[in-house]
Amino acid sequence: MRTLTCVPDESTAKVHTCRAPFMLHRVMIPPDPIQRFAELFERAKQAIAVDPNAMVVATVGDDGRPSARVVLLKDFDARGFVFYTNHESRKGREARAHPYAALCFYWQPLNEQVRVEGRVERVTDAEADAYFQSRARGSQVGAWASLQSQPLATREELEARVAEVEQKYAGQPVPRPPHWSGFRVVPDRIEFWHAQESRLHDRHVYLREDGGWRTQMLYP
């Protein structure tokens, strides 16, 4: 793990003096980016105790303004990267209206970053149902109670909605709300970044072409 060191500066508001040493490491380039991601993700799970599957998801609105937030990756395979959400949330509305998104993983203990770009598609109902039933009951209730991204007057209003849902489904399974499902980001571009000394980082991008992947190094 890198230790961040900040050189004393006359202003505590400045962070440009913060530096971290990097482990020199030559990156092997497998032909399949999903395989490469899977190997890195296994290392991240060993190195990061809390939420190694955290990622930034960026979408764009009708006005062209991007929005980004941290969510949890719930599944990935050759088809793409899956997360779940309320489809009436801001990210849900934007992903449906403009079905492209960007993801970013940053695993600081590994000196690794992965960026994913691609088309967004909805997961199947069977996939969404299976994942929803694996969630804690409180999270299932919350999926019904929360009008995600809508204005909320008081915390008590939310708690009252939670109580109503709990009463409605007392003693029985909580079904998946029709507005709650998953999105799969189908990648057409995946970039791997590995930190090196003097900011001469390793960057390799995979571009989907003719049903396969073409790799290309990039200047840091």
Swiss-Prot record:
Gene Ontology molecular function, alphabetical: FMN binding; pyridoxamine phosphate oxidase activity
Keyword annotations from UniProtKB, A to Z: Flavoprotein, FMN, Oxidoreductase, Pyridoxine biosynthesis
Domain of life assignment: Bacteria
Record note on cofactor: Binds 1 FMN per subunit.
Catalytic activity: pyridoxamine 5'-phosphate + O2 + H2O = pyridoxal 5'-phosphate + H2O2 + NH4(+); pyridoxine 5'-phosphate + O2 = pyridoxal 5'-phosphate + H2O2
Main enzyme class: oxidoreductase
Family: Belongs to the pyridoxamine 5'-phosphate oxidase family.
Role noted for this protein: Catalyzes the oxidation of either pyridoxine 5'-phosphate (PNP) or pyridoxamine 5'-phosphate (PMP) into pyridoxal 5'-phosphate (PLP).
The protein's name in its UniProt record: Pyridoxine/pyridoxamine 5'-phosphate oxidase
Organism: Myxococcus xanthus
